[in-house]
Amino acid sequence: MKEYVMLLLLAVCSAKPFFSPSHTALKNMMLKDMEDTDDDDNDDDDNSLFPTKEPVNPFFPFDLFPTCPFGCQCYSRVVHCSDLGLTSVPNNIPFDTRMVDLQNNKIKEIKENDFKGLTSLYALILNNNKLTKIHPKTFLTTKKLRRLYLSHNQLSEIPLNLPKSLAELRIHDNKVKKIQKDTFKGMNALHVLEMSANPLENNGIEPGAFEGVTVFHIRIAEAKLTSIPKGLPPTLLELHLDFNKISTVELEDLKRYRELQRLGLGNNRITDIENGTFANIPRVREIHLEHNKLKKIPSGLQELKYLQIIFLHYNSIAKVGVNDFCPTVPKMKKSLYSAISLFNNPMKYWEIQPATFRCVLGRMSVQLGNVGK
């Protein structure tokens, strides 16, 4: 249960907009989670996203002790310094701190020694500051850092020398234009990368930038991509590229991502998806193609036996064929659709044959008609 509480707290901290929980509620949640590890933990626990091993020594929340940065609240190895108008990282952060919350301040720069000695640091939250620079040696001693939140700042590049222990990096809404080749070198624990709302173009992703990295979730929405990047990790389970400038999806674009389960391409400029494209992602369960310029249902959907959700609303689709969604081979086993959205397309909905949706969970799973008309 403790690990889920930690996940909930960190998810709230990364949400947009952020509504800070009361200090009392935050303390109660963290007390349940932050008693899990200490400096004597072995490497297996250090490499766990949600450490569960109990400490060898009894736990004492260090708000029993006087050491705490001025104006902050310290409890259960958490240092909570958000919304204080800080212009720099405060001193006197206890060495055994597991989580530092510095969001919603006015910090412009992270210096080399700001987190020096925090060898147990697990999560660092720096969302919504004015960061333009992070020293390349800042994270050399934070070798247990698993979650780093840098969203809503003014960073022009992904920080160098990130800890190899990092599992989640969120750098949404910054000014990042390039992902350099060695940015994630050796970061085998990185599983989640969220970097939407950055002015990133396709040529800004250098060849080999993700080489050797096992990332499961990447979101590069609200950027300047004109096509699906080809050099992302083949381990991807989720790829979200919504709100870009992608106009076509070619056969080779998804060939590298055969394990993909969720694909987000909504709110682009897609007019054509090449035949056979979706055969390259046979495990996909959810596809978002809403708010594009498609004139027909993409081919190959009926062959995706795990596909359950397909969003095609707000396109230019004029016709739906009886076999566009469901298998034509009687013995083929396919998951039932739980959602097919086709509303706000210039089609004559009354002409769609009932058999078109023979592999749908129920009538409520299909959305037709023109909303607002």
Swiss-Prot record:
SMART domains to which the protein is assigned, alphabetical: LRR_TYP, LRRNT
Top-level taxon in the UniProt lineage: Eukaryota
LRR repeat locations: 96-117, 120-141, 144-166, 167-186, 189-212, 235-255, 259-280, 283-305, 306-327, 328-349, 350-373
GO molecular function ontology, one term from the record: calcium ion binding
Keywords: Biomineralization, Calcium, Disulfide bond, Extracellular matrix, Glycoprotein, Leucine-rich repeat, Repeat, Secreted, Signal
Keyword set includes Mitochondrion: no
Record field: transmembrane: none
Protein name (database record): Asporin
Species the sequence originates in: Mus musculus (Mouse)
Organism lineage string: Eukaryota, Metazoa, Chordata, Craniata, Vertebrata
